[in-house]
Amino acid sequence: MRILFDNINFNSRSGPNSFGKKLRDGLLKLDHDVRDSFATGENPDVSLSFIINQKPTMPNVLRLDGIYFNTSQDFNALNDPIRRSYIAADTVVFQSKFNQHLTERYFGSVENTYIIGNGVD
């Protein structure tokens, strides 16, 4: 399977990027073609987006590890691109049950949701 990892930096050690790198390494061991970009004409089978979907032209799995809810910030504006990605996703993977409940409270429920914690080792 050809998998596009969207909105990720494999060289970063931050939370979502670190998780993405471990997941990529595991998928590569299973002989999947995993990249953060594909050349024109090379069509991935699915996109795995981290927090925000930047490539909405193919089937998409969105991995969410949180949303903004701090009332001292304009959390509605900060959440808007996340909310749009959440609603458009074919499947959503949450980092935790807390994250799922918080997201559903602010954005509503969608179909095809799963919880996969960070322990991917």
Model-derived regions, located:
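N-terminal pre-catalytic "stem/leader" segment of glycosyltransferase-like enzymes
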Residues: 1-44
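Short beta-strand scaffold positions
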Residues: 49, 94-95, 115
